[in-house]
Amino acid sequence: MKKIIKIRRFKFPFTKEKTINFASVRNKISYPDFLDIQIKSFTNFFCINYTYKNISNKGFYKVFIEYFPISDSKNKFIIDFISYKIYDPLYSIEECIKRGLTYNVYIRARFKIYRTRKRKITIENKRTKYFETIYQDVYFGTCPYMTPSGSFIFNGSERVIVSQLHRSPGVFFGQYDIPNLPKISYARIIPLKGSWIELSTDINNVMYIYLDIKKRLPITTLLRALGYTRDIDILNIFNLAEEVNINKVNYKKFLGRTLAARIFKTSYQKFEENDILLERNIKLKKYHIDIILYYKIKVISLYKKNEKNEKNLYYSIIHNTLKKDPTNSQKEANIYIYKELKDSFPKNDKKAKLFINKFFFDETHLGEVGRYKLNKTLKLDFPLKDQILNIEDIISIIENLIALCNNKKEVDDIDNLANRRVKTVGEQLYTQYTIGIARVSRIIKERINVKDNETLTPLELINSKTLTSVINSFFGTDELSQFMDQTNPLAEMTHKRRISSLGPGGLSRERAGFEIRDVNYSHYGRLCPIETPEGPNIGLISSLCVFAKINSMGFIETPYFKVKKGKVVINEAPIYISSDQEYGKLITQANAILNYKTGVLKNNIIVRVNADFPMVNYKKINYIDVSTNQIASISASLIPFLEHDDANRALMGSNMMRQSVPLLNPKAPIVGTGLEKHLAQYVNALIYAEGDGIVESVDANNIKVKYFNSEKEKLLSFEKRIKTYKLIKFRKTNQNTCLNIRPIVKKGMYVTKGQVLCEGFATQNGKLALGRNIKVAFMPFKGYNFEDAIVISEKVVREDWFTSIHIDEYSLEVRDTKLGMEEFTFDIPNFNEENKKKLDKYGIIKIGSEVKPGDVLIGRITPKKEGYPSSEENFLKAIFGKKVGTIKNTSLKADSSLFGVVIDTKIYSKFSSKEDEQKQFQIKKLNNKFMKNLKLLRKLLINKLILVLEGSVSEGILNSSYKEIIPKGKILNKLNLKKLLKNQEIIYQNWVNNKYKNNLVFKIIKFYYLKINELKIKLKRKKNRLLIGDEITSGIIKIAKVLIAKKRKLKVGDKMSGRHGNKGIVARIVKEEDMPYLEDGTSVDLVLNPLGVPSRMNLGQIYETILGWAGEKLGINFSTPIFDGASIEEISKYTDIANLPSFGNTYLFDGETGEKFDQPVTVGVIYMLKLNHMVDDKMHARSIGPYSLITQQPLGGKSKFGGQRLGEMEVWALEAFGAANILREILTVKSDDVKGRTKTYEAIVKRETIPNPGIPESFHVLLKELKGLGLSLKLEVIKKKEKKNQKIKVRIEIKEKDIIKYKKKVKEIKLKKLKELKEQLSKSNKKK
């Protein structure tokens, strides 16, 4: 089984770039593995790192245990699950991406089928024998397997399973208001499996239990059914009553006391046959006592002294509920509950009792989390294995609910993270496999009963197709299985750490209220309060904080250092605690430490206690944050000076960083936060040195490194000393951005362990680099930067600072049609020879060709229907002897906006019988190469063992058959080791009497077999590729793919942004000499509007601009962690060192006139990003296209080739200008005047005057809708002739006469129908 190997993460060596860190709080804790949320969950589900002993109740194994064993209806035969095995993927990750395949593993499960009793069976030759237990390995489908970067490859595209945040199983107490009435309290039991159960009081203080939403019962009825038969039993649960002995001597002391339970004539057990003497809740008087004594009743139930008080809700609720209880015994209660839930009477009491036990206890499965929450809320102490609801739970819930009614208990906050848990990828897969295996078990049950039992085998019973279809539909269509955002490394990482409240079993964006979307105090250090979408999903999709982890139960934890007696325990590891463990604890911020060496805190500190922020003495504090950026997610932690930005703009900044396009030449920011280095380690494409060594050779595609291995490493390793690393070149990402890696080391360079060897895909020197540092001036520029518009220098475009590469994929298929086979060909009919120059012999455009609109990308011909041949065709047929014109050109051509370069072409085809012999020869070649490699490995192994064992005394060496090949006591030498180990299968045991040597031998053999396994997998993959061919969907014979790279420079209309939510559109590209310039002649590269800063309250960009300028001048980088960044004094210090004006205020000169501007301008260096919202993708103009069927208006959007929306505000603008003719044209002919637009088209074609428009279709729709309401609307055009011109007035009237006529017609129709019916009935009666 192939393990998920995590991406290498090493510390970076010291680089030439000097970085100054402004952090006052130094992180004493390293960042956790950011991909743990995905990888750990998946490995736990498949039990990859577990031993067989620990596997029994975990993940995938648990799914089988839930549904197996399965028996037939007569319980004769049983099929049981034994174990499962997961096989390595057939294709590598790279192959799956290129070929459009799924990176999956094959699962085989071992089953046995046996008979419950021994019985002789007759076989074909009439001999008899006993039915033997059959063991079989069954193919159990495939499952997409997680890549080391935490994603899945499904049908060639990378996907992510987003974790879901949903309500935790357990019990929750709440209240809701009814106007002018007391509050209604309720307790809701939410199980892991089964229906919800709710206990609630009403306005009369009666407690009901709600089942299946609508069904409700008094709670005392349920208690009776559960064994608390008598009233006194129910009252004793809550300690409200006592049983007393009564006689003629002591009766006086009971006068005035209240009866707690009914009194019957004879024994309580036979009360159904007897009359009730006294009802409950009666104050005992002398004549009541006389009745009791007369019937010789010795024991009565009374309420305890001072308990009967109307304000006591304990008494009131139980007493009122008993009043409403229609039952008097357990039998009655059982029948009553059965009748309420099933709407029918049970056959007997036993059936009713079994149904109640199954409904409340067997089907209500709490799960481990539900039991934990119940224990925590109700202060119980049941083991976590006890995962079924019990009587004690119900009684405790009733007590807590009464306490809530009595204001002695707080209401639960359902939005608190203590009551919400995360469903990670492993748990979601577990849910899908339970659905799939449940279907498989149903099929097994059907087959085991139908088939001949005597010849049953597991292979005949089990069909894994149903399971595979469930898993594939989950990965392909589920709301939580999403197409991975791969725009840049940050977008990829954020997507993997995303937490969604939507999805199956979660919330819907339409119903989710403000409370659930709002920031909760429990989110601190767990869910980022900043990063969330801006649209309808705001607050429903969040991101994990930097240090947050998810525990085994699915609750989010965050780390804290302990504080003891006012001192931080820095030497100990921080503890991770969940929201419910944090409740009531005093926690302070990371910057509250006075002395970092001793850990002493400041005297009076503001702390956080739940949702409050009091100031307390330092000795009372329990915990302290581990870092200042603990509160934020990765994206928010990358924004320098975040503390100076408004939260809304910080949200936009963190979202827009994920939209930034990887540039051709990116640069790491001068002003960063320190997280850039750590995040770059998770870029899967980057390569780091595995040890110290020298670079042997470097080219664009490969880096070869020769490592210096120690003597021990040389002895153990079977790998070559020179390791070759392949670089990813121009790979298309999901968002069509370009993933291209280039080397940054040179031949002969010495590399150290952990050193980055390459860069690219938004990284530079091992740092995240999403954009460029650019010189900026905050000033107006002739109105061109009005409303956030951006003015840039021509130099930026010329030097390709913001140039990016985008890759588009075009494909064409060849099918076998009814008329014949389609074909990829160079010989395209009616096509110029010049245009064919770019095509290869298969008709596919050559790699390196420049593509222009109209160029053929893939040449294809398709057979077409034959008509009657013309005389010319007959003539050509007679000359050339073949049919002409029976094919048509169906080639793929470049569209009107496509300009680029072909970077790759591929043809995928199914296996053909002609290639069989060639393939067999290649397989032989592969087998021979594999055997050679095995022999070499064997020689290497023997040499290594000789080196270790020569001269040692043998302890008895065995082969794989456990036969002794070297006897005990024999001295080992070269000859006997070579002879005996040459052809023997080696197993490990204690070979010699030396522990150290035995350990070395064990490791050598282990690495030997690992290497063999690696070679076997490679051989299997290569053979598979040859035998199976390319995996193509049925009906398709060949697929040709062409990848075209487009180089996009920065244009007017492209969207840009900073890291502080300061976004804008490029409005004008100005010549470098016309841009404002500094006193030394340096022109600025970017001009931003200063009015975009104060109203948006994102001053962080100003701080960054000033410090960035100082960094550029001094040639140093700065690290300013969030909430612990550089102060104004520290920034001023570096601007003074760089001889720059304070706060960047400097006088600029006009580039066109050379005149000095009147006012000083803020100038500096800011980090800008180019976003994936480019004008080339947005520009669109409609000529002809589809219309809406109802309104007859053009559709909207570029994908539908729609028109531009002209709303009411645009109409006002045209009205204000008095552009009546344009307005009329837009509202009629260009919109929904069906007849008018055809006439207009005809007039344009015929070059005639455009006719007057007719009535828009939207008006006809209005008429139809009014008719639907029974209103008849008519248009009357009145023409009045005057002296000079003719005026036309339009009068619209709704006439009541028409409505009356309509109603009369309806009545007449009804009367006619009635008459017809009467006539038919009279005729039928006459016949009878």
From Swiss-Prot:
One of its GO terms (cellular component) is DNA-directed RNA polymerase complex. One of its GO terms (biological process) is DNA-templated transcription. PROSITE patterns: RNA_POL_BETA. Keywords: DNA-directed RNA polymerase, Nucleotidyltransferase, Transcription, Transferase. One of its GO terms (molecular function) is DNA-directed RNA polymerase activity. Gene3D superfamilies: 2.40.50.100, 2.40.50.150, 3.90.1100.10, DNA-directed RNA polymerase, beta subunit, external 1 domain (2.30.150.10), DNA-directed RNA polymerase, subunit 2, domain 6 (2.40.270.10), RNA polymerase alpha subunit dimerisation domain (3.90.1800.10), RNA polymerase Rpb2, domain 2 (3.90.1110.10). DNA-dependent RNA polymerase catalyzes the transcription of DNA into RNA using the four ribonucleoside triphosphates as substrates. This is DNA-directed RNA polymerase subunit beta. It comes from Karelsulcia muelleri (strain GWSS) (Sulcia muelleri).
